Amino acid sequence: MQKRLTLLGSTGSIGDSTLDVVARHPERFSVYALTAHRNGDKLVEQCLRFAPEVAVVGDANTAAHVEAKLRAAGSKTIVLYGPQALVDVSKSDGCDTVVAAIVGAAGLAPSLAAARAGKRILLANKESLVMSGAIFMDAVRDHGAILLPVDSEHNAIFQCMPRDENEHGGISKIILTASGGPFRTREPATLADVTPDEACKHPNWVMGRKISVDSATMMNKGLEVIEAHWIFGLAGDRIDVLIHPQSVIHSLVSYRDGSVLAQLGNPDMRTPIAHALAFPERVDAGVDQLDLAQIVQLSFEKPDYTRFPCLALALKALEEGGIASAALNAANEIAVEAFLERRIGFMAIAATVDAVLNALPNRSPNGLDDVLAADAEARRLAAEIIAKAPAPRVERTV
């Protein structure tokens, strides 16, 4: 039976990779809805190729632009805009599968709506679990939704774990691998001089700018630890992080009998996306087969928390519980945005997040409204801290 997809965040890197896989298997997958924020021209191109029933954008001006271009091209795709439209296409009867690929907290509401509608959810928006893990997982369970992780690390763990949840007691721990990003060996004293372009040059993966910065600070790995805690139901002390610069082993599961299972593959997001789209079957993802004979080295090292303070902050937030993870994520989003706009330096990202976590009293949320209130308060505090921060160093020229 053909799966009907709503693709949240279709113009980003995950969206591109998803549509590449979809295009390879038109007999298996079709598109009900595509969504973007402001990249209207790219959304138009996607709509003309995949002919969704609905397209959603962030605002009325972008909607008018997209609709005009689609009508001129003879497309009948309905164009909607705004947060409620994202929720509507996520819970619509027109789709059975929702690919949640919106970056940041903006992806929470539509992802949660998909869970409450009992959809098959391919989760690439880790913020949904970082912000509201208990609420989200309760919705998945209570409404019979199916959650399939798309992040390469979590998808790798999913593939290495037993299908029967009753057998999870045999697991000792899970190990998330990390490339270490572009600054794994850079002198720590020079990190204050890092530019946005340098931070966005990931050594192995092709990603959007925000997640590239998160990878450079290793905040991304910290968020993934929190995500893994909720998806797999393991305490933080049973989730390890290991730097693996080659990005060939995507994660591992260690069992009590001494066995360690790992998932390997070329670093290409189409592999975990194809796995989740077709699960429990396997389909061609368009990715080259891994040639083990060509791999010169597989190396591993423990993370340096002095070099990567954001990772330490994320682990601390998981340990503290309450609203700490939501505040961590919100402060980080504001700080990364400021860094990309060159309003703060690279090391100020961690400093801003730390200051917000220290300033915001932790508490247990009673529901989604409490989570969203904590998110808003953390963003306000982060913006205030950044406004008072000294200007970053001027980029050196040769």
UniProtKB/Swiss-Prot annotation:
EC number: 1.1.1.267
BP GO terms, sorted: isopentenyl diphosphate biosynthetic process, methylerythritol 4-phosphate pathway involved in terpenoid biosynthetic process
Cofactor(s) annotated in UniProt: Mg(2+); Mn(2+)
Enzyme class: oxidoreductase
UniProt: Mn(2+) binding residues: D151, E153, E224
Keywords on record: Isoprene biosynthesis, Manganese, Metal-binding, NADP, Oxidoreductase
Protein family according to the UniProt entry: Belongs to the DXR family.
Protein name in UniProt: 1-deoxy-D-xylulose 5-phosphate reductoisomerase
Record organism: Burkholderia ambifaria (strain ATCC BAA-244 / DSM 16087 / CCUG 44356 / LMG 19182 / AMMD) (Burkholderia cepacia (strain AMMD))
